[in-house]
A protein has these predicted regions:
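Signature of dsDNA virion morphogenesis modules
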Residues: 1-195
Length: 195
């Protein structure tokens, strides 16, 4: 991570109907760099063609995501509160089953259903499941049952590897002091994960 780039916090404003998360997308290269997994009844990492369920990280809390728009390079992060607000927004707008492929509005997966949504919240005792033990507090995990066999096969064969959310967000630059505090916290979190 380059320290000289600005960091922006992404959030939604629950009072502003224009900010929302409208879709989750199955993508080949998730920005948070976390691939999803498929689960069987008995063995943890095998595919179960009857269930056709994929599980993974939808949003990784406090994970700096590199972005480049035009000549500007920067990082964006979702903090725990922003992710909590996204969950509320998802629920009140009924967007749980909105799933597409590679953020293409013309490639909506009509036969997919969210069957699990779980936000890690250590304070409340909602700790990370063993498979996701290295995920940050506040991260959001989801599972989709995908009945569309073609899309499921694309996930199974590794063409689609993870989730990526899409929507309209509030983006604010973190102050320099906050940026340094944030980077220090990220470094400490990474160190603790490596222990």
């Amino acid at each position: 991570m380059r320290k000289d780039l600005p960091i922006y916090r992404i959030s939604i404003d629950l009072e502003n109907p224009k900010t929302t998360v409208s879709f989750n997308s199955l993508v080949s290269n998730p920005a948070h760099e976390k691939s999803f997994q498929t689960f069987s009844k008995v063995q943890r990492y095998e595919f179960n063609d009857e269930k056709q369920i994929v599980t993974g990280v939808a949003i990784s809390a406090d994970f700096p995501i590199y972005r480049k728009q035009g000549n500007e390079e920067f990082y964006v992060v979702f903090d725990k509160q922003a992710i909590s607000d996204i969950v509320v927004d998802y629920a009140r707008k009924g967007n749980f089953n909105n799933l597409n492929v590679e953020h293409k509005s013309n490639d909506v997966v009509n036969n997919a259903f969210m069957v699990m949504l779980y936000q890690i919240d250590n304070e409340k005792g909602f700790t990370a499941p063993e498979r996701f033990k290295d995920e940050s507090d506040g991260s959001l995990l989801v599972s989709y049952k995908i009945l569309d066999k073609e899309v499921y096969e694309r996930a199974k064969n590794g063409e689609l590897t993870g989730f990526s959310i899409e929507g309209d967000f509030v983006i604010e630059e973190l102050m320099k002091e906050t940026e340094n505090e944030f980077l220090t916290q990220v470094i400490e979190d990474l160190k603790s994960m490596l222990k």
